[in-house]
Amino acid sequence: SHCGPLLFLLFINDINQVVRNSNILLFADDLKIYKDIRSYEDCVLLQEDIEKVGVWCETNLMEVNTKKCFIISFSRNTTAVDYQYSLFHHKVSRVSKIKDLGVMMDQKLTFTEHVQLVSCKSYKILGFINRHLKEFPIDTFKLAYISLVRSILEYNCTVWSPFYQINIKTLEGVQNKFLRICSSKLGIGHQGYQYNYQELRKVLKLDSLELRRTKNDLLFLHHLISGEIDCSSLLEKFKLRCPSRSTRNHPVFKVDFHKTNYGFFSPIARLSRLANTYNDEVELFGTSRNRFKSQLKTSKLL
């Protein structure tokens, strides 16, 4: 029914009231309970909240599939607090990686496995459309690539955008494979296995995937600032820079210092640096979505 999803959300809307010691993330019927664990006492508090959620489910006559419940600890430390959590007297399985809303996350949040997963899937789909669209025009083949392959490579990329060259090249390799196929279809010559991918992208009017991720990051930030993405808790993490005197440079956001690559390339820091870098090329504040997209297309730096 049309009202079913809405009624379900209203029905479970009070589940956050039973969780007192932890935080929750709720998307439809997908619930995540999380807490910063620093000691054994924190584990006990998290277990109490898990049990309270179990009681809430029993009270509201909702069944929980314990086989689909998992525990994962996100930490870059070599040793983490180990605790056996349970639900309805059943041990909750502990995993080292988990797929959440289409993104594969490992314990250290490197997203390397996600890159490998989406690239492998994309290669298979690219091979499929190449076999079945051999006789179709190049425009049709390009449209199929954009719709079925590139969309997989860019899904939620603002969250997991890679910064190690090995992962960047892994993703770019999928599009390069597409470009090689197009080169053959168009009769564009090449020397052995050496292809001029930059020229092929110009012919097909495509950007590199790395450049597209940069544009998607800026577009995401624009949507967040303009209110198209309604998330005040995320917006407040960006710190506006208010200098006490006039300076030559005009950075928009203040970027905190990070000692590690993980912190330096984290989404908030990365998006803040991008906004500062392209501040003179694009206008994040007071522009419509279409106007901002036009600025991205005409930017000399992008």
For each feature predicted by the language model, list its residue ranges.
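Short, conserved non-catalytic motifs in the polymerase core
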Residues: 1-7, 34-39, 94, 108, ...
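Mobile genetic element proteins and their domesticated derivatives, centered on retroelements
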Residues: 4, 12-15, 29-31, 57, ...
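Active-site palm subdomain of RNA-directed nucleic acid polymerases
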Residues: 5-34, 136
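Basic, alpha-helical interaction scaffolds
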Residues: 20, 90-159
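Catalytic palm subdomain of template-directed nucleic-acid polymerases
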Residues: 31-58
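Short, conserved micro-motifs composed of acidic
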Residues: 48, 63-98
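Short, charged alpha-helical motifs in flexible N/C-terminal segments and linkers
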Residues: 54-72, 167-243
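Charged boundary/loop elements
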Residues: 59, 67, 155-168, 259-302
